[in-house]
Amino acid sequence: MTATVRRSRLSSEREAELYQAVIELVREVGYEAMTMDAVAARSRSSKATLYRQWQGKPQLVAAAMRHNRPVKTLDVDTGSLRGDLHRLADEVGDAAEHDTSFMGAIGHAVSSNPDLAAALQEMLIDPERAKLDAMVRRAVDRGEIAADAAAVEFFAHMVLGAVIARKFLEGKFADGEYLSRYVDAVVLPALGVV
């Protein structure tokens, strides 16, 4: 008879320490140069612990990003789409400058690492997109926008696109004031909200 191997569960405090080590290392050396050995050393843990909890580096980094994300889309529900989007703009704007070196490293790595892209898609992007879709469904249910509004399909792209594009096009962060103006000038009119 063989003994069942139990996967030990890390405390939330210990998990947060590991995630912080991951974020710091990606900021310092980039995703490609970050190793599980370096994470183990920085977090004073063993590689075995890391691999027991996460399949590998892509999953660990995606989990760290999910844990440390500054904007919690799920928490945004003011009772109106305009209110939701302005609240989201403020939160995203406050966080935009916070992690540019980290996000730059991840953005570069995603383009050449399909495992990282898949882990981020599963653990971060899909859940956040579902929350944005729920925001639109609430607005449809309240009668704020038509269910068949053509721009509904592109809602997530409009909301997230401004954050990414402003840095590349203007060299500036998309702060809350900029994003609020963008919401009023682009997103709401595209959805048919006056």
Question: How would you name each of these model-derived features?
Answer:
Residues A118, E122, D126, V140-A185:
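Hydrophobic/aromatic-rich alpha-helical bundle segments in the mid-to-C-terminal region
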Residues M1-V5, R87, D94, A130, ...:
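C-terminal peripheral helix-coil segments that are non-catalytic and often amphipathic
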Residues K72-F102:
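Hydrophobic alpha-helical connector segments
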Residues L18, A33, G56-V61, V71-K72, ...:
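Short amphipathic alpha-helical segment with a characteristic S/N-K-E followed by hydrophobic residues
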Residues G56, S112-P114:
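Short loop-to-helix capping motifs
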Residues E97, A105, D115-R142:
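Amphipathic alpha-helical packing segments from all-alpha helical-bundle domains
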Residues M1-V29, A33-R44, A48, Q59:
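Basic, helix-initiating cap at the start of DNA-binding domains
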